[in-house]
């Protein structure tokens, strides 16, 4: 059973796997005439520039195909950042008012590395083009039209402010690596987001990994403030491109009129902001990186990191636990990586606390996963 949502549903707090910064990418599209499919995965909010045109027509911030004058319908194949269970989607038609795709459906598959290697290479600017027969033949061999249907044919709404956001809950526990987005018959979509839970394969116990990475299956399970940017941005695998792609809080209203410092150099402030993450695997942390890239006039004064072991449980505000110190309050500076060696007990969760407020681009917690049968 599938449900259409009209307000931001709970699944939008989960990790996201289609956007460029998460590692999603387009591997095939039937048509990119007015606007290339890659723009649908952009991290930025869609914009509209009234007098901007290309040699092919009106510039649009999203994926837009030409008006169909041949049989069939348009579709594309996306590779997700990692294998995941899909819990919901957002299809944003912003500014596509007379040219949005009227209907869509979503199919999905879990491809082997060998099957993934059969996908065509998609390089260069595809604006003004359609598929070539060689690429289509590669995709046809994977029977994409027979993939699991996770969203049946469903109407889309036009890209006005009050109708642009089309949320779609998905009820399935299958894990997938690729999706096929069908639009009927043609038109445009500004942005696509895929929310869910990563299903990473446990690494060998002697291999160091980033335990809090999106690709390891880590998730954000709570936070105090996300006014300008969600804490889940910090666990994306790639370096951030802008300040918008990080965790940034509002300025705290309880900050002192005149700032003073503690003996260790950190500022005397009454408040702080926090975010809790469940690690991809239980593990022991040996090295931490806190990246303040792009945060130049709004980086936190200091950061501390604590850990806790909750077994298989998720963290909730009602969780009874004692947080153990992994990284004591440590000074931060603008627009750079901060590396710390550390030693932690076995932990399943971490709490990142900044004081008093500000922004952090990325956080990495390198260490070793502990297999469940060894716990």
Q: Which residues does each PLM region occupy?
A:
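Juxtadomain low-complexity/linker regions and immediately adjacent membrane-anchoring helices
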Residues: 1-71, 87, 95-151, 157-162, ...
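Short beta-strands within extracellular/lumenal beta-sheet-rich domains
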Residues: 69-80, 266-280
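Helix-boundary capping/turn motifs
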Residues: 78-84, 242-245, 278-283
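Generic structural detector for well-ordered beta-strands
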Residues: 79, 169, 276-278, 341, ...
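C-terminal, well-structured subdomains that either form a transmembrane helix-short loop-helix hairpin
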Residues: 274-294
